[in-house]
Amino acid sequence: MNTTDDVSCAEIYVSGRVQGVYFRGFTQKTATSLGLMGYAQNLPDGRVKVVAQGKRSCISELLDHLHIGPELSNVECIEVGWMGLSDTFTDFFIKR
């Protein structure tokens, strides 16, 4: 049974004006404050990919923040896929 305290992993794709507007830094700061591990990465197609591991409730809270984004961003769409824990991260970082 999945509860909000289960450790989960989400693969998130954020579309819109999300590159060059501090979106990855915003994501890293927010995820770290929520105790999440993983990374944020710019993709060649203009999206940002986020992999977040931690309590499902914290990932859901991160998603709420990502919908808003930093001041200069304009989030148009967020796609979320829940996946098994394949990698173990020790922090939340910006992947280049």
Curated annotation (Swiss-Prot):
Residues 9-96 form the Acylphosphatase-like domain. Pfam families: Acylphosphatase. One of its GO terms (molecular function) is acylphosphatase activity. This is Acylphosphatase. It catalyses: an acyl phosphate + H2O = a carboxylate + phosphate + H(+). Its EC number is 3.6.1.7. Belongs to the acylphosphatase family. Keywords: Hydrolase. The gene is acyP. It is an enzyme of class 3 (hydrolase). The keyword Hydrolase applies. The keyword Hydrolase applies. The active site is at R24, N42.
